[in-house]
Amino acid sequence: MTRFLSISSFRKRLADLLKVRRGVYAGVKSEICTAFRNATIEQIRQNRDMILMNNESVVIKLRLPDKRQRLSRSDGYRLVYMVLKTAPVVVLLDIYPKRGPSQQLDIEDNELNMLILEFVSELKSKKLLEHDIENDLNAKQ
């Protein structure tokens, strides 16, 4: 069973997107869940845009559609996540829209490095949060 964890920056970014007026990004949690639901860890590790790879993990940028606004994968969201090579674990690092009031065109190398350092720090301090991909990305009890 694949475990889905997140760092605090991801959770803050997701919460900020959900607060944007008129519910512009209201479908973001659903799109994330749909992308991973019923996928094996092998499927999650492959067929994506790899950003960074080392001996222990792969960082991937996944293109997600925004079906609520009728945007294709190229105009929807970018989900940046890390997949561990030694365990069935996915760590959600960042999410950003390509369109709309909170749009971001890409993730810079220094931003990515900061997210990875945050993961290492939160892993050590046990601040990572586990999510239920079958239950709208809610925190697992």
Model-found features: residue ranges?
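A broad, low-specificity signal marking well-ordered, structured residues that form hydrophobic/aromatic
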Residues: 4, 59-60, 90
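Arg/Lys-rich, positively charged N-terminal/basic patches that mediate binding to nucleic acids
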Residues: 1-36, 117-141
